[in-house]
Amino acid sequence: MSGGKSAQGPEEGGVCITEALITKRNLTFPEDGELSEKMFHTLDELQTVRLDREGITTIRNLEGLQNLHSLYLQGNKIQQIENLACIPSLRFLSLAGNQIRQVENLLDLPCLQFLDLSENLIETLKLDEFPQSLLILNLSGNSCTNQDGYRELVTEALPLLLDLDGQPVVERWISDEEDEASSDEEFPELSGPFCSERGFLKELEQELSRHREHRQQTALTEHLLRMEMQPTLTDLPLLPGVPMAGDSSPSATPAQGEETVPEAVSSPQASSPTKKPCSLIPRGHQSSFWGRKGARAATAPKASVAEAPSTTKTTAKRSKK
């Protein structure tokens, strides 16, 4: 593997993979004088390399990763699948979100089981370029998925395929008993043991699920931010005479108070004699009034305040007698 510190490709002037970049993203060392020797041996032992979102344009300089099982190259600017034959042990390859236009140079990866080529620029499928060992394949976001009979063609060409574009190939899923009886080869990058088929698939499905949840959470956050930018209800113009929401002060409806109060309360002269007692008797004393006067007092005009002077004169005459 080239030991140059620069990530610039000598031919195209693009960004390529270097020892320095791999070390920066995937290794940590104590500061001592034997760093170079330790780095050489540790690179050879790496099983997982993450180089996503580094602006990489070219795949190269992977010869020193002899034990590599998983390679993450998503979110770069890679245009061509190349220079992977030097890592035949590779089982997990993510090239999502690049600028790849065709599937090629994958037949030298006989152990490859997971391949993510989603969100690229692939228009035409060359099914004979896919390794027969594939269990999970993701081509979503490419125009090649729109061709007639796409799913049937892919599943027919890949007899071991169990999941295509996030949808299981139902007829090929094996039972849970067979899963439990499978071997326990270990892949630390996926946090648990898995076999070359079903167990590996389970761990990869969990990895995909975490990516989906992250995308959903990002979409929800963007939606909430857009909602916060919408005008509130109180910012909208109100109809005439309608109070603002949340305003319970009396001054909020002055027009209604001025128009309706004179109509609801009538003067004693304008109302009929039978309605005077109801308008003048307070609610707190109404029950005692009915107890003293009985039913006749409800309609008798003598109960009005206007009759009070005559009652005073009668009392004065009795006192003189």
Swiss-Prot record:
The keyword Repeat applies. The modification Phosphoserine is found at S175, S182. Its main location: other. PROSITE patterns: LRR. It comes from the Eukaryota. The keyword Chaperone does not apply. One of its GO terms (biological process) is sperm axoneme assembly. This is Leucine-rich repeat-containing protein 46.
